[in-house]
Protein backbone atom coordinates (compact mmCIF):
# COMPACT_ATOMS: atom_id res chain seq x y z
CA UNK A 1 0.00 0.00 0.00
CA UNK A 2 1.31 3.42 -0.96
CA UNK A 3 2.50 5.47 2.02
CA UNK A 4 1.08 8.97 2.52
CA UNK A 5 2.69 11.60 4.73
CA UNK A 6 -0.72 12.55 6.10
CA UNK A 7 -1.50 9.00 7.23
CA UNK A 8 1.64 7.53 8.82
CA UNK A 9 -0.09 4.94 10.97
CA UNK A 10 -1.08 1.59 9.53
CA UNK A 11 -4.76 2.27 10.14
CA UNK A 12 -4.71 5.25 7.79
CA UNK A 13 -8.45 5.15 7.28
CA UNK A 14 -8.81 6.57 10.77
CA UNK A 15 -7.15 9.76 9.58
CA UNK A 16 -9.00 10.30 6.34
CA UNK A 17 -11.66 12.54 7.87
CA UNK A 18 -11.82 14.77 10.91
CA UNK A 19 -15.11 16.31 11.98
CA UNK A 20 -16.94 17.53 15.04
CA UNK A 21 -17.66 13.96 16.14
CA UNK A 22 -14.02 12.89 16.04
CA UNK A 23 -12.87 11.20 19.25
CA UNK A 24 -9.97 13.47 20.19
CA UNK A 25 -9.16 11.23 23.14
CA UNK A 26 -7.95 8.41 20.89
CA UNK A 27 -7.38 9.60 17.32
CA UNK A 28 -4.34 11.91 17.62
CA UNK A 29 -3.14 10.31 20.84
CA UNK A 30 -0.69 7.89 19.22
CA UNK A 31 0.68 10.47 16.78
CA UNK A 32 1.65 12.91 19.52
CA UNK A 33 3.18 10.11 21.56
CA UNK A 34 5.43 8.72 18.83
CA UNK A 35 6.37 11.82 16.85
CA UNK A 36 9.67 12.26 18.70
CA UNK A 37 10.72 8.80 17.47
CA UNK A 38 10.72 10.14 13.91
CA UNK A 39 12.94 13.14 14.59
CA UNK A 40 16.73 13.46 14.36
CA UNK A 41 18.58 13.02 17.65
CA UNK A 42 18.48 15.97 20.04
CA UNK A 43 22.11 17.01 19.41
CA UNK A 44 21.79 17.11 15.61
CA UNK A 45 20.61 20.72 15.30
CA UNK A 46 23.44 22.04 17.49
CA UNK A 47 26.00 19.87 15.67
CA UNK A 48 24.97 21.36 12.34
CA UNK A 49 25.17 24.88 13.75
CA UNK A 50 28.67 24.33 15.12
CA UNK A 51 30.22 22.24 12.33
CA UNK A 52 30.67 23.62 8.81
CA UNK A 53 31.62 20.11 7.68
CA UNK A 54 28.38 18.54 8.89
CA UNK A 55 26.28 21.38 7.51
CA UNK A 56 28.01 21.12 4.14
CA UNK A 57 27.40 17.36 4.12
CA UNK A 58 23.70 17.87 4.76
CA UNK A 59 23.38 20.53 2.07
CA UNK A 60 25.19 18.34 -0.46
CA UNK A 61 23.07 15.33 0.44
CA UNK A 62 19.82 17.29 0.09
CA UNK A 63 21.01 18.57 -3.28
CA UNK A 64 21.69 14.98 -4.37
CA UNK A 65 18.31 13.80 -3.08
CA UNK A 66 16.59 16.57 -5.03
CA UNK A 67 18.48 15.53 -8.15
CA UNK A 68 17.83 11.79 -7.74
CA UNK A 69 14.14 12.23 -6.94
CA UNK A 70 13.38 14.71 -9.71
CA UNK A 71 12.27 12.01 -12.14
CA UNK A 72 9.51 10.92 -9.76
CA UNK A 73 7.95 14.43 -9.67
CA UNK A 74 6.71 13.80 -6.12
CA UNK A 75 7.47 16.40 -3.40
CA UNK A 76 6.31 13.96 -0.71
CA UNK A 77 8.85 11.39 -1.87
CA UNK A 78 11.63 13.98 -1.65
CA UNK A 79 10.43 15.16 1.77
CA UNK A 80 10.39 11.61 3.11
CA UNK A 81 13.89 10.95 1.77
CA UNK A 82 15.26 14.06 3.53
CA UNK A 83 13.53 12.94 6.72
CA UNK A 84 15.37 9.62 6.47
CA UNK A 85 18.61 11.48 5.73
CA UNK A 86 18.42 13.75 8.78
CA UNK A 87 17.54 10.90 11.11
CA UNK A 88 20.39 8.80 9.71
CA UNK A 89 23.03 11.54 9.80
CA UNK A 90 22.07 12.39 13.37
CA UNK A 91 22.95 8.86 14.48
CA UNK A 92 26.00 8.05 12.34
CA UNK A 93 29.44 9.61 11.92
CA UNK A 94 30.37 10.49 8.35
CA UNK A 95 33.90 9.48 7.26
CA UNK A 96 35.64 12.55 5.83
CA UNK A 97 37.93 10.43 3.65
CA UNK A 98 35.08 8.90 1.63
CA UNK A 99 32.92 11.68 0.17
CA UNK A 100 31.31 9.27 -2.31
CA UNK A 101 29.48 7.63 0.59
CA UNK A 102 27.34 10.75 0.95
CA UNK A 103 25.98 10.25 -2.56
CA UNK A 104 25.31 6.59 -1.85
CA UNK A 105 23.43 7.52 1.33
CA UNK A 106 21.38 10.11 -0.56
CA UNK A 107 20.54 7.67 -3.34
CA UNK A 108 19.59 4.99 -0.82
CA UNK A 109 17.31 7.41 1.05
CA UNK A 110 15.56 8.17 -2.24
CA UNK A 111 15.31 4.46 -2.97
CA UNK A 112 13.72 3.74 0.42
CA UNK A 113 11.36 6.68 0.09
CA UNK A 114 10.37 5.63 -3.43
CA UNK A 115 9.62 2.11 -2.23
CA UNK A 116 7.35 3.54 0.46
CA UNK A 117 5.60 5.90 -1.92
CA UNK A 118 5.54 3.56 -4.92
CA UNK A 119 5.42 -0.10 -3.81
CA UNK A 120 6.10 -1.42 -7.32
CA UNK A 121 9.31 0.58 -7.62
CA UNK A 122 12.66 -1.26 -7.96
CA UNK A 123 16.30 -0.17 -7.72
CA UNK A 124 16.52 -0.31 -11.51
CA UNK A 125 14.09 2.64 -11.63
CA UNK A 126 16.57 4.95 -9.89
CA UNK A 127 18.38 7.59 -11.97
CA UNK A 128 21.90 6.23 -11.48
CA UNK A 129 23.36 7.12 -14.86
CA UNK A 130 26.91 8.36 -14.44
CA UNK A 131 27.19 6.83 -10.95
CA UNK A 132 29.23 3.75 -10.11
CA UNK A 133 26.71 2.38 -7.60
CA UNK A 134 25.14 -0.95 -8.42
CA UNK A 135 21.96 -2.47 -7.00
CA UNK A 136 23.86 -4.50 -4.42
CA UNK A 137 25.66 -1.45 -3.03
CA UNK A 138 22.39 0.46 -2.78
CA UNK A 139 20.61 -2.40 -1.03
CA UNK A 140 23.45 -2.80 1.48
CA UNK A 141 23.31 0.90 2.32
CA UNK A 142 19.53 0.68 2.59
CA UNK A 143 19.95 -1.97 5.27
CA UNK A 144 22.41 0.24 7.16
CA UNK A 145 19.93 3.13 7.06
CA UNK A 146 17.04 0.88 8.08
CA UNK A 147 19.03 -0.27 11.10
CA UNK A 148 19.88 3.28 12.14
CA UNK A 149 16.22 4.29 11.80
CA UNK A 150 15.12 1.17 13.70
CA UNK A 151 12.93 0.30 10.72
CA UNK A 152 10.61 3.24 11.46
CA UNK A 153 9.88 4.10 7.86
CA UNK A 154 6.31 5.38 8.24
CA UNK A 155 7.56 8.77 9.33
CA UNK A 156 5.39 11.04 11.45
CA UNK A 157 5.87 14.49 9.91
CA UNK A 158 4.09 17.86 10.13
CA UNK A 159 1.74 16.65 7.39
CA UNK A 160 0.46 13.99 9.79
CA UNK A 161 -1.14 16.68 11.98
CA UNK A 162 -2.62 19.02 9.38
CA UNK A 163 -6.06 17.42 9.08
CA UNK A 164 -6.39 17.27 12.86
CA UNK A 165 -5.49 20.93 13.42
CA UNK A 166 -7.69 22.14 10.56
CA UNK A 167 -10.59 20.17 12.03
CA UNK A 168 -10.37 22.33 15.16
CA UNK A 169 -11.22 25.48 13.21
CA UNK A 170 -14.74 26.85 13.01
CA UNK A 171 -14.64 28.29 9.51
CA UNK A 172 -16.92 31.29 8.96
CA UNK A 173 -16.85 31.30 5.18
CA UNK A 174 -19.48 30.76 2.50
CA UNK A 175 -17.40 27.87 1.18
CA UNK A 176 -15.60 26.26 4.16
CA UNK A 177 -14.41 23.33 2.05
CA UNK A 178 -12.63 25.70 -0.31
CA UNK A 179 -10.98 27.47 2.62
CA UNK A 180 -9.90 24.14 4.13
CA UNK A 181 -8.35 23.17 0.82
CA UNK A 182 -6.56 26.53 0.56
CA UNK A 183 -5.27 26.29 4.14
CA UNK A 184 -4.00 22.77 3.55
CA UNK A 185 -2.39 23.66 0.23
CA UNK A 186 -0.63 26.80 1.48
CA UNK A 187 0.50 25.14 4.71
CA UNK A 188 1.84 22.15 2.77
CA UNK A 189 3.84 24.36 0.41
CA UNK A 190 5.31 26.21 3.38
CA UNK A 191 6.14 22.97 5.21
CA UNK A 192 7.97 21.59 2.18
CA UNK A 193 10.11 24.73 2.04
CA UNK A 194 10.94 24.69 5.76
CA UNK A 195 12.61 21.29 5.62
CA UNK A 196 15.87 22.63 4.17
CA UNK A 197 16.26 25.18 6.99
CA UNK A 198 18.10 23.65 9.95
CA UNK A 199 16.36 26.09 12.31
CA UNK A 200 13.28 23.87 12.23
CA UNK A 201 15.06 20.62 13.08
CA UNK A 202 14.67 21.32 16.80
CA UNK A 203 10.88 21.55 16.65
CA UNK A 204 8.50 18.62 16.88
CA UNK A 205 6.48 17.85 13.73
CA UNK A 206 3.22 18.81 15.46
CA UNK A 207 4.66 22.20 16.45
CA UNK A 208 5.80 22.88 12.89
CA UNK A 209 2.37 21.88 11.60
CA UNK A 210 0.55 24.18 14.02
CA UNK A 211 2.85 27.14 13.41
CA UNK A 212 2.82 26.75 9.63
CA UNK A 213 -0.97 26.44 9.62
CA UNK A 214 -1.33 29.60 11.70
CA UNK A 215 1.03 31.44 9.37
CA UNK A 216 -1.05 30.38 6.37
CA UNK A 217 -4.31 31.23 8.12
CA UNK A 218 -3.16 34.77 8.91
CA UNK A 219 -2.47 35.34 5.21
CA UNK A 220 -5.71 33.75 4.00
CA UNK A 221 -8.21 34.86 6.65
CA UNK A 222 -6.64 37.32 9.14
CA UNK A 223 -9.96 38.16 10.81
CA UNK A 224 -10.35 34.56 11.97
CA UNK A 225 -6.71 34.21 13.00
CA UNK A 226 -7.30 34.94 16.73
CA UNK A 227 -9.85 32.14 17.03
CA UNK A 228 -7.69 29.74 15.00
CA UNK A 229 -4.75 30.45 17.29
CA UNK A 230 -6.88 29.95 20.38
CA UNK A 231 -8.18 26.61 19.14
CA UNK A 232 -4.71 25.20 18.50
CA UNK A 233 -3.39 26.50 21.82
CA UNK A 234 -6.24 24.75 23.64
CA UNK A 235 -4.98 21.37 22.48
CA UNK A 236 -3.14 20.15 25.58
CA UNK A 237 -0.44 18.38 23.57
CA UNK A 238 0.62 21.68 22.00
CA UNK A 239 3.16 23.64 24.01
CA UNK A 240 2.33 27.32 23.54
CA UNK A 241 5.93 28.50 24.02
CA UNK A 242 7.24 26.08 21.41
CA UNK A 243 4.44 27.02 19.02
CA UNK A 244 5.19 30.72 19.47
CA UNK A 245 8.92 30.20 18.94
CA UNK A 246 8.38 28.17 15.79
CA UNK A 247 5.88 30.71 14.48
CA UNK A 248 8.38 33.51 14.99
CA UNK A 249 11.08 31.46 13.25
CA UNK A 250 8.78 31.13 10.23
CA UNK A 251 8.19 34.88 10.29
CA UNK A 252 11.92 35.62 10.44
CA UNK A 253 12.49 33.32 7.50
CA UNK A 254 9.64 34.97 5.62
CA UNK A 255 11.13 38.41 6.20
CA UNK A 256 14.54 37.25 5.01
CA UNK A 257 13.10 36.05 1.71
CA UNK A 258 11.50 39.42 1.13
CA UNK A 259 7.94 39.17 2.44
CA UNK A 260 6.14 42.10 4.04
CA UNK A 261 7.50 42.71 7.54
CA UNK A 262 4.60 44.83 8.72
CA UNK A 263 1.91 42.17 8.30
CA UNK A 264 3.95 39.52 10.07
CA UNK A 265 4.61 41.79 13.04
CA UNK A 266 0.86 42.24 13.40
CA UNK A 267 0.41 38.49 13.49
CA UNK A 268 2.96 38.16 16.30
CA UNK A 269 1.08 40.63 18.45
CA UNK A 270 -2.21 38.88 17.82
CA UNK A 271 -0.81 35.43 18.50
CA UNK A 272 0.70 36.44 21.83
CA UNK A 273 -2.59 37.64 23.34
CA UNK A 274 -5.64 36.04 24.91
CA UNK A 275 -8.60 36.44 22.60
CA UNK A 276 -11.85 37.44 24.24
CA UNK A 277 -13.74 36.84 21.00
CA UNK A 278 -13.04 33.13 21.35
CA UNK A 279 -13.76 32.67 25.04
CA UNK A 280 -16.72 30.46 24.23
CA UNK A 281 -14.43 27.81 22.73
CA UNK A 282 -14.25 24.65 24.79
CA UNK A 283 -10.88 23.26 25.73
CA UNK A 284 -9.80 20.27 23.70
CA UNK A 285 -8.19 17.91 26.16
CA UNK A 286 -6.13 14.95 25.06
CA UNK A 287 -4.97 12.83 27.95
CA UNK A 288 -2.35 10.13 28.01
CA UNK A 289 -0.78 7.83 30.54
CA UNK A 290 2.61 9.22 29.62
CA UNK A 291 3.68 12.17 27.52
CA UNK A 292 6.92 12.50 25.57
CA UNK A 293 9.48 14.83 27.05
CA UNK A 294 9.27 18.41 25.90
CA UNK A 295 11.93 19.02 23.30
CA UNK A 296 14.44 21.68 24.32
CA UNK A 297 14.13 24.81 22.24
CA UNK A 298 16.24 27.85 21.61
CA UNK A 299 16.32 30.61 24.23
CA UNK A 300 16.40 33.44 21.71
CA UNK A 301 14.43 36.57 22.61
CA UNK A 302 12.21 38.29 20.08
Curated annotation (Swiss-Prot):
Keyword Cell division in annotation: yes
Pfam families, sorted: Cyclin_C (PF02984), Cyclin_N (PF00134)
Superkingdom of origin: Eukaryota
Keyword terms of this UniProt record: Cell cycle, Cell division, Cyclin
UniProt keyword Iron-sulfur, yes or no: no
GO BP of this protein: cell division
Alphabetical list of PANTHER family matching this protein: CYCLINS
Family: Belongs to the cyclin family. Cyclin D subfamily.
Protein name per the record: Putative cyclin-D6-1
Organism for this UniProt entry: Arabidopsis thaliana
Gene name linked to the record: CYCD6-1
Amino acid sequence: MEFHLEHPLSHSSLHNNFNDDTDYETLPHSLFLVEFQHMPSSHYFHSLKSSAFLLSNRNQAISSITQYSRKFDDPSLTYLAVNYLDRFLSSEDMPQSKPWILKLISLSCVSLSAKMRKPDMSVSDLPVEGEFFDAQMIERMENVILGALKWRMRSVTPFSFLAFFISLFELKEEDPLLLKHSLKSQTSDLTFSLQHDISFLEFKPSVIAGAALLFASFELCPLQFPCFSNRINQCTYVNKDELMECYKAIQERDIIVGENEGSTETAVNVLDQQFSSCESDKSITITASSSPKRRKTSTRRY
